[in-house]
Curated annotation (Swiss-Prot):
Stated role: The glycine cleavage system catalyzes the degradation of glycine. The P protein binds the alpha-amino group of glycine through its pyridoxal phosphate cofactor; CO(2) is released and the remaining methylamine moiety is then transferred to the lipoamide cofactor of the H protein.
Keyword Oxidoreductase listed: yes
Cofactors required: pyridoxal 5'-phosphate
Keywords: Oxidoreductase, Pyridoxal phosphate
Quaternary structure and interacting proteins, as annotated: The glycine cleavage system is composed of four proteins: P, T, L and H. In this organism, the P 'protein' is a heterodimer of two subunits.
Record protein name field: Probable glycine dehydrogenase (decarboxylating) subunit 2
Molecular functions per Gene Ontology: glycine binding; glycine dehydrogenase (decarboxylating) activity; pyridoxal phosphate binding
Taxonomic lineage from the root: Archaea, Methanobacteriati, Methanobacteriota, Thermococci, Thermococcales
Modified residues (N6-(pyridoxal phosphate)lysine): 273
Length: 502
């Protein structure tokens, strides 16, 4: 049984002692006189913790011992594709030619960096069937906002200002309706049918002259392939709308089918999911957006282009109807480097195998867990890259909820799946094992879920009071949402005002 390391570790600010030094800045070669305007000068010294190098190393080592990541074990967060990140990605990204390049350098001095971005675009175009890409968006939701903003600009440019509605399935990622709303659209929800796919009759009834587009993930968040996608595309296009592809689940179809061939006009991808770049605790990510040829003039500036005659890469600002910039500079470059490294190592056939094994793993787990007391499998049985079970029967019969199952899994040294999503499945357990998990790990995960089922029906308190072996057991989710304390400064100020007592 797993027992997490537990250190009563202070923050690095609490460990700070005046005068301790871990690093000394190099002296300038010559005196530098920089005239910084008074209004931009700090009024007080920068509050940096003062520690020796050994103290810093020990502090972060102790914290790492309490952490769990993709290098620790199975991490099957549904719809997140928490696959192993090959270490060669880090080796290439830390190369001085990558690490020390500066975005304000002259184009002539960064030809290698521009070539990397251009080459990645060629890979993504081939994988998705799109005609042009921007690498600027910083993450998936940023990519979504970029994509729907392009759709909005396209309709306005055509004088179709009445197209104010964005259709979104009820199984969609929560960021889809949020991104559409931020771009100024009214969100229209499309229900799923009994198979877990888009209800075509409901879609037919929803489209109109007000339809700007439909945002769709394929496979969807149940792990089910939208097998009527060509008919869906036909319905949306006939109404004058555009089809948007949320690339969160692209890992299921790499090298097998392309969004562009399914009828999609706009695509966003997640390099930090499909292409093995780190999720990094919320960033940095990368959410490139690809479009069909008729939309390329709306992409953010600059694009990276290649002048074959002079064998030169350059930043192309000649994008007549561009929606403008969606992130400063050119995107998260080090993430782009990691993704291209992965693609070059895997190759065309390797990417096909990625999808094959990801789908195999998800279906193997589904069949092993299916029929276990308390877990119900909604929708079609055949899944793609992920599977969703409902713990609703267990909750009704024992009082043990999906949250309790997730917490109990931590005691087995296994990361919990995504829970309570998609919203159309009550007490959802959303499991995406990815292709980098072994059969033995899958077997162990299923056995843990089966054991939790046995505990729920024989001694439910063991599950409802879990986890028992972690450094932190259950946090106050309501307090965390109502009064988040996310910085040391916030903590000190709230503590001084007596608003928190911990």
């Amino acid at each position: 049984m797993f027992h997490q390391a537990k250190w009563d570790e202070p923050t690095i600010f609490e460990l700070s002692r005046p005068g301790r030094i871990g690093y000394t800045l190099p002296k300038p070669i010559e005196d530098v006189d920089v005239d910084i305007p008074e209004k931009l000068r700090r009024k007080s010294p920068l509050n940096l913790p003062e520690l020796s190098e050994p103290e810093v190393v020990k502090h972060y080592t102790r914290l790492s011992e309490m952490n769990y990541g993709v290098d620790s074990g199975i991490y099957p967060l549904g719809s997140c594709t928490m696959k192993y990140n090959p270490k060669i990605n880090e080796e290439i990204a830390s190369h001085p030619g990558v690490a020390y390049v500066h975005p304000y350098q002259d184009e002539g001095t960064v030809q290698g960096a521009l070539k990397i971005m251009w080459e990645l675009e060629q890979w993504l175009k081939e994988i998705t069937g799109m005609d042009r890409f921007t690498l600027q968006p910083a993450a998936g939701a940023n990519g979504e906002f970029t994509g729907v903003s392009i759709i909005r600009a396209y309709h306005i440019d055509r004088g179709e200002t009445q197209r104010t509605e964005m259709l979104v399935p009820d199984s969609a990622h929560g960021t889809n309706p949020a991104s559409a709303a931020m771009a100024g659209f009214k969100v229209i929800e499309i229900p799923s049918n009994e198979n877990g796919t888009v209800d075509l009759e409901a879609l037919e009834n929803a489209v109109s002259e007000r339809t700007a587009g439909l945002m769709l993930t394929n496979p969807n968040t149940l792990g089910i392939f939208e097998d009527e996608i060509l008919e869906i595309a036909k319905i949306v296009h006939k109404a004058g709308g555009l089809l948007y592809y949320d690339g969160a689940n692209l890992n299921a179809v790499l090298g097998k089918i392309r969004p562009g061939d399914m009828g999609f006009d706009v695509v966003h991808l997640n390099l930090h999911k499909t292409f093995s770049t780190p999720h990094g605790g919320g960033g940095p990510g990368s959410g490139p957006v690809g479009v069909k040829d008729f939309l390329k003039d709306y992409l953010p500036v600059p694009l990276v282009s290649y002048d074959a005659e002079n064998d030169r890469y350059y930043l192309d600002y000649n994008v007549p109807r561009s929606i403008g910039k969606v992130k400063e500079l050119y995107g998260n470059f080090a993430v782009i480097v990691r993704a291209l490294t992965y693609l070059k190592i895997m190759g065309r056939e390797g990417l096909k195998e990625v999808s094959e094994v990801a789908v195999l793993n998800a279906n193997y787990l589904t069949q092993k867990l299916k029929g276990t007391r308390g877990y119900e499998l909604p929708g079609k049985e055949l899944r793609k890259h992920e599977t969703v079970f409902s713990a609703e029967p267990m909750k009704k019969e024992t009082g043990v909820k999906a949250l309790d199952v997730a917490k109990r899994l931590l005691d087995f040294c296994m990361h919990a799946p995504t829970i309570y999503f998609p919203l159309i499945v009550h007490e959802a357990l959303m499991i995406e094992p990815t292709e980098t998990v072994s059969k033995e790990e899958l077997d162990a995960y299923v056995e843990a879920l089966k054991r939790i089922s046995e505990e729920a029906y024989s001694n439910p308190e063991v599950v409802t009071s879990a986890p028992h072996n972690t450094a932190v057991r259950r946090v106050d989710d309501v307090l965390a949402a109502k009064k988040p304390v996310i910085t040391w400064r916030m903590y000190r100020e709230l503590k001084e005002r007596g608003e928190i007592d911990y």
